[in-house]
A protein has these predicted regions:
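A residue-level marker of the well-folded mature domains of exported/periplasmic proteins
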Residues: 3, 21-334
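Gram-negative bacterial Sec-dependent N-terminal signal peptides
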Residues: 1-22
Length: 334
């Protein structure tokens, strides 16, 4: 790993630095939000495998933290200088990254968003991602049935304000649960829903998820349902609940479907999670980059890469797969 600037981490896989490298084989860049989140680790694995398969050179970079827009901008500039003709990016800041994307496109670079849309979504050439609103709806529907007969006292551990993915999952969960919620196009969290007693930002991080859950329990010790933006946040929430002696009284639902998260479903930490497929997103992005390098044909619009509800215990009226299936599928692992 080689650090080129303090704001981000930049690495090269089979990289010959310089524009000349692009003349012999396609050069494709992958910029993720962080390199510590298992989701983005798996995405990088998928991009690496597809690049090797198709004979492309892959550059990779990641912000230090989720929300590190400056690091992503610098990474993009370095990749263009190194000859990348397609850049795949999971935008940390859906709006702030737009000027850098426009500059790249003006230089003939195809820019494809993975997992997270930009704002507006049309700023990139294409988007390969989960339908995050549907992912939220699925776990909301599951939670509604799982909580039958109980008065819901809900906490949400979200990403951070204004991010499309965070809003779509949160609002989808509310919709699936039967509560008032903004539609899939809104980047604002629905917060006035009956039963939601606490909302906290976790940044998708286990430690911050634990802190957020602790704070929510202080506000309302009677919380019995927790939505989390992802499985690391869910794991943090469970730690807080266990420390308070409440882990058996609370249903946790989440999104991601990574192998570690599916194990947590099997262990009863998470009741159900919506599984997405970063390996598929990355592979499709690399393939599109190779196609552009060879033919000049760009991708366009949104491609749904799929979502599956994985549950520890099936509930009536909500289609789901079991833990074994989730482990077989986790993030496209097999």
């Amino acid at each position: 790993m080689k650090k080129l600037a303090p704001a981000f981490v930049f690495s090269a896989l089979t990289l010959a630095v310089g524009v000349a490298a692009a003349q012999s084989q396609p050069v494709i860049g992958l910029i993720t939000k962080t390199e510590s989140n298992p989701f983005f680790v798996k995405m990088k694995e998928g991009a690496t495998a597809e690049a090797t398969k198709l004979g492309a050179k892959l550059l990779s970079a990641a912000g230090k933290t989720d929300g590190d827009n400056a690091g992503q901008v610098t990474a993009m500039e370095n990749m263009i200088a190194a000859g990348a003709k397609t850049i795949l990016i999971t935008p940390s800041d859906a709006k702030a990254i737009i000027p850098a994307i426009k500059r790249a496109q003006q230089q003939g670079v195809q820019v494809i968003a993975l997992d997270s849309p930009t704002d507006p979504a049309t700023a990139v050439d294409g988007l390969f991602a989960t339908d995050n609103y549907r992912a939220g709806v699925l776990i909301g529907q599951y939670a509604k049935v799982a909580m039958a007969g109980k008065k819901p006292v809900i906490a949400t551990l979200d990403l951070f304000p204004g991010h499309p993915v965070g809003a779509q999952r949160h609002n989808g969960f509310l919709k699936g649960f039967g509560l008032t919620a903004p539609d899939a196009k809104s980047n604002h969290l629905g917060g006035a829903a009956a039963g939601v007693v606490c909302m906290a930002d976790s940044f998708g991080d286990a430690a911050k998820g634990q802190t957020g859950m602790e704070n929510c329990l202080q506000k309302n010790p009677g919380i019995n349902l927790v939505y989390t933006i992802n499985e690391p946040a869910a794991a943090g929430a469970f730690k807080a609940l266990k420390a308070a002696g409440k882990e058996k009284d609370v249903v946790i639902v989440s999104v991601d479907g990574g192998c570690a998260g599916i194990k947590d479903v099997g262990a009863g930490v998470i009741a159900a999670t919506s599984q997405q497929y970063p390996l598929k997103m990355a592979a499709m992005g690399v393939a599109a980059g190779v196609e552009y390098a060879k033919t000049g044909k760009k991708v366009s619009g949104y491609t749904d890469t799929g979502v599956t509800l994985i549950a520890g215990k099936a509930v009536a009226g909500v289609e789901s797969k079991d833990v074994k299936t989730g482990m077989d599928l986790c993030w496209g692992n097999k």
